UniProtKB/Swiss-Prot annotation:
Keywords: Amidation, D-amino acid, Disulfide bond, Hydroxylation, Ion channel impairing toxin, Neurotoxin, Secreted, Signal, Toxin. This is Contryphan-Mi. It comes from Conus miles (Soldier cone). Exists in two forms, due to cis-trans isomerization at 56-Cys-hydroxyPro-57. The cis conformation is the major form. Residues 22-52 are annotated as: Disordered. GO terms for cellular component: extracellular region. It comes from the Eukaryota. Its main location: secreted. Residues 23-40 have a biased composition (Basic and acidic residues). PROSITE patterns: CONTRYPHAN.
């Protein structure tokens, strides 16, 4: 039983070390990247734009 506990602990240490090493890679392109807004109006703005083009039946809410 003691050997099994040691084996499980060693496996856990190896896995956590592997995760730390993989997550520690330097990614300069991501670090210096400027976030861009692909949808300037946002999701609701896009939805409202579709409603305006298709003829919105709810005039008070369509703007």
């Amino acid at each position: 039983m003691g050997k099994l506990t040691i084996l499980v602990l060693v496996a856990a240490v190896l896995l956590s070390t592997q995760v730390m090493v993989q997550g520690d890679r330097d990614q300069p392109a991501d670090r210096d990247a400027v976030p861009r807004d692909d949808k300037p109006g946002g999701t609701s703005g896009k939805f409202m734009n579709v409603l305006r083009r298709s003829g919105c039946p709810w005039d008070p809410w369509c703007g």
